[in-house]
Amino acid sequence: MNSLIPGSLAAVNALVLQHIACEPPGVFEDVLRERGVALHRVEIDEGEPLPDWRDFDAIVVMGGPMSANDDTSLPWLIEEKRLISEAVRSGLPLWGVCLGVQLLAASLGARVYPGPEPEVGLLPVTITEHGRSDPVFAEAPTELLTLQWHGDTFDLPRGAVRLASSPAYENQAFRFDRAYGVQFHLEVSGEMAREWAEVPEYVSSLARTLGAEGAPAFLAAIEERADSMRETGRALFEAWLDRVVAPAGAIAS
């Protein structure tokens, strides 16, 4: 997949919603900084307040160990989903990853629920027919190698378009207006994955799927394939910036 010719997006203000320190935007943040985007990060799990989404041109919603349904124990999720719903239904571009795609689905009225088994591993996803004609996913290979590390899944929101799927989980990526969500990770470095292996919720899903002795080989495999996956992630994210975020800014102005 070829990246678009990079250009400055210095007029763009992006809001990054982060749910745990070890799940930053990774290569997506690299792209934002390279393109001159002004980045405002909110570490929601640390109690940082949510700003007014109207002050931003795009939102990036990252992953985390919590469920999109944990409203009782994490009441800030209610406000976050309200922000996402208002922003997306108003046409603001959004990019959601793992928990981020689940929060996007929930904010659009879809059900988020535990899957039959955690999906953990370096696993392929297939671009759908709609994905092959999508402005962001059209130039992607038909099959992508991705890092999967999740236990919950979601129903496709009404009005959304499925862009990618896998044998285990039908909904791997979707588009709703200018909002895109992906269940998988393409932003992660080997170092980030090693940090994830210290998070209790992630350790549990890792043990259930790969066994107690499976972690070292899994982390070594991520280390080996991280650069290739990050290049794919970079290309998709740049396509979203250039074909969704930038045109939306031109329309808004």
Show the residue positions of the predicted features.
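Short glycine-/acidic-enriched loop or helix-start segments at secondary-structure transitions
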Residues: 25-27, 70-72, 105-107, 157-158, ...
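Hydrophobic/aromatic beta-strand patches that form the interior of the parallel beta-sheet core
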Residues: 15, 40-42, 60, 95, ...
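Glycine-rich, phosphate-binding/catalytic loops in enzymes
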Residues: 31-34, 75-79, 112-113, 164-165, ...
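Pocket-forming structural segment of enzyme catalytic cores
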Residues: 108-192
